[in-house]
Swiss-Prot record:
GO cellular component, one term: cytosol
Superkingdom to which the source organism belongs: Bacteria
EC annotation from Swiss-Prot or TrEMBL: 6.1.1.5
Motif 'HIGH' region: chain residues: 66-76
Keyword tags: Aminoacyl-tRNA synthetase, ATP-binding, Cytoplasm, Ligase, Metal-binding, Nucleotide-binding, Protein biosynthesis, Zinc
Residues binding Zn(2+): 908, 911, 928, 931
Lineage per the UniProt record: Bacteria, Pseudomonadati, Pseudomonadota, Betaproteobacteria, Burkholderiales
The name this protein goes by in its record: Isoleucine--tRNA ligase
Oligomeric and partner information: Monomer.
GO biological process: isoleucyl-tRNA aminoacylation
UniProt cross-references to NCBIfam families, sorted A to Z: ileS
UniProt key word NAD: no
Known role: Catalyzes the attachment of isoleucine to tRNA(Ile). As IleRS can inadvertently accommodate and process structurally similar amino acids such as valine, to avoid such errors it has two additional distinct tRNA(Ile)-dependent editing activities. One activity is designated as 'pretransfer' editing and involves the hydrolysis of activated Val-AMP. The other activity is designated 'posttransfer' editing and involves deacylation of mischarged Val-tRNA(Ile).
Amino acid sequence: MSNKKADSKPQAKYPVNLLDTPFPMRGDLPKREPQWVKEWEERGIYEKIRAASKGRPKFILHDGPPYANGDIHLGHAVNKILKDIVVKSRNMAGFDAPYVPGWDCHGMPIEIQIEKQFGKSLPAAEVMSKARAYATEQIEKQKVGFKRLGVLGDWANPYKTMNFVNEAEEIRALGKIIEKGYVYRGLKPVNWCFDCGSALAEAEVEYKDRTDPTIDVMFAFAEPEKTAQAFGLPALPRAEGGIVIWTTTPWTIPANQALNLHPEIVYALVDTERGLLIIAEERVAACMADFKLTGRVVATAPGVKLANLRFHHPLASAHPGYKRTAPVYLGDYVTTDTGTGVVHSSPAYGIEDFMSCKAHGMTDSDFINPVMGDGRYIESLPLFGGLSIWDANPKIVDALNAAGSLLRSEKYTHSYMHCWRHKTPIIYRATSQWFAGMDVTPRDDGKTLREAALEGVEATAFYPSWGKQRLFSMIANRPDWTLSRQRQWGVPMAFFVHKETGELHPRTLELLEEVAKRVEQSGIEAWQSLDPRELIGDDANMYEKNRDTLDVWFDSGTTHWHVLRGSHKDQLQFPADLYLEGSDQHRGWFHSSLLTASMIDGRAPYKGLLTHGFTVDGEGRKMSKSLGNGVDPHEVANRLGAEIIRLWIASTDYSGELAISEEILKRVTEGYRRIRNTLRFLLANLSDFDFAQHAVPVDEWLEIDRYAVAFSAQLQTELLGHYEKYEFHPVVAKLQTYCSEDLGGFYLDVLKDRLYTSAADSRARRSAQTALYHLTHGLLRVLAPFLSFTAEEAWKVFQPASDTVFTETYYAYPEVAGSAALIEKWALLRDVRGNVTKALEEARTANRIGSSLQAEVAVHASGARYDALTSLGDDLKFVLITSAATVVKVDDEAQESVDVAASKYQKCERCWHYREDVGAHADHPTLCGRCFSNLFENGEIRSAA
């Protein structure tokens, strides 16, 4: 610190050491923060951090890329600020912790924006050109928002999944997993959005309530004799009747190809007014009530006995096109929780149906698949051709009723799959797609993808720990990954496929590398414009370019390949130490990254996974436009300061929901002010202190100063332990307690008399300032990861010759001999002080004293308390902030008490103590003896406080 005082007020007759500081009481954050952002950028602070960290062990937090579309919202702020706290705290812990931000650039949302602005008929080359420009514009907007929040990083050189080198490396990653044998092409039901016109990833599906028709439908007997035999009857009692299914998707009935029963469930043949009905025995009573029928069980048989029986399609009498029969297959997935215990199977529209029919010998060409990509039936479908499936639902119900097959129809509200972009219902739809097989044995006969990924989960540290089971169960139960998409703005699956067989070209791996080289030079547009003959010559007569693009989750899911080991390999490394995202990313980026790394490397791409919750309002409700309870981080930053957002995030247990409201922000702001006031006190009282010139050796410090430094060092050890485990809210809570109670409520309160009234250059005052110097060093560094603007502002006052607080590491406090015993002793003293303060307050309330300095106290103490109190000698009064203090020994704790009496002496004009020696010097009648000594003689001697 400089030994120059700030401009001081006119000197009083008996001056005290009341110093000022350029660090203002009011933060004026909305005005000052943008100036710091500008200064950090202009002065290259991030680059200076990198230079200072060079050669240290690396710590890599890999940034999960936000999508390059739209303004940043509060969820973005939570995510980026948590990452910033981690990175800054790891740098200060002695690591080289770079932060390379990234953006996810391809995919549907941007393509939709281009369609909205320019229509759907743009040539592919123009779509790509405009998509690139749009993504670039969005990135620049978001970048400004993130920097405004105080996030330091390599903003000049972020990674973008649309950069040519990243696109090229993604194609190479695709080549890697093909080479290993994980990729296959097949017909399979996938999540399909009619509005997207494309398959969806699991992470792009959300569930919302929807009301649909629920129907019970009878499939009439096609083999009455065999059916009778299955139930142990010589013949069916009557010809009418059949087997009954229940479904909430009437639109799948035209595509029915089978019926599924559980092998062990007992099925009943029930005689009713509508004929003989086959229903699970335990569902008979409920179904009869639902169908408003009376029934008598004629016979029963387990499902296994009914296998391979055939029944007529329920629309067989309505149109010749439905004159087919459905076989009974057995499936363990059939239950009797609801419905009839019989499941109708349209294999083109359900994964379990598909697997069951495949297992029973159906080939891809056998599947009836009448729903087109836009959600309409093909024109040739009998009765319903050209209709959208949702419009067809009621017409199918009517047709079933007219055919005599309908037993019941009602409205049913259930949780149903929707597209996360369009918020519209989606279906499973069998299409020819490229898949990564979860249970495929790779060519090296190593572990399957599922096995490798589950091992990766086990090897990963999770924060919080419950994330492990969540990700494990998702991987354990997930279907094969649909890699392909039917879009334009995406990285191509740059294959050449045989026009007749659909087989890959035998030189596929070599060709992928050739395409990657071109993409590296010109982007994915190089594939669009490529004439196949350039690469495969005359083979172009037999092979054509595959038109599918890669799932965007493959884009971001391979950043461990094309960023950590690709575009930014000089700064980053594989595996990353930490991936940090919202808890939805267990099925998103965490998930896709784990799968791709398991295929390419046989391991997880991260050592640790940290998840945070979502933001909610003060009442725990999710933020939504309809509720009008959203909080805009820009608005809060411009009104209260980004520092308040940072402090709110750091002080909240992010493992659950993060609640925010005006009341919560008000409390955060009050907490901020307490920290700021502490810093202001420290800086003001160091403004005439130069460490090189004024520092006092540790062994010459007053005892309370040694205690304060020992206590602060112990606290720092605790805080760094929390930082290491990414536990930020205990860091904030303990620092707020430290500032308000340990410093403001105790140490600094005791120190004021010594700082203000001791001789300016006395050992007593310089001892206090030396301790404050160390405390300030320590405090600013542990605050810096989350209160970045304030710590930097204070640091520039405290260490003006230093570039930035962010190139520092956590402070090495000086060793204090016997620190543990000292901390224990002063904990006792603080406990006694609490009792004294309470007694003083009672005396003040009773009008026996005014301020605490008007009091003289006698503390009755026993044992260790007595020893601790007497060890302070006459300095005890300074600790208790009274004008006099004596200690009386008692036998035990039960006899301990505090006596308070008003001093009978005069008040010193300068120090405000009431002392017998006020006026002892005739020339200075209002001054006490110690103030006279401090001003005109050698000064008082203090040893403890």
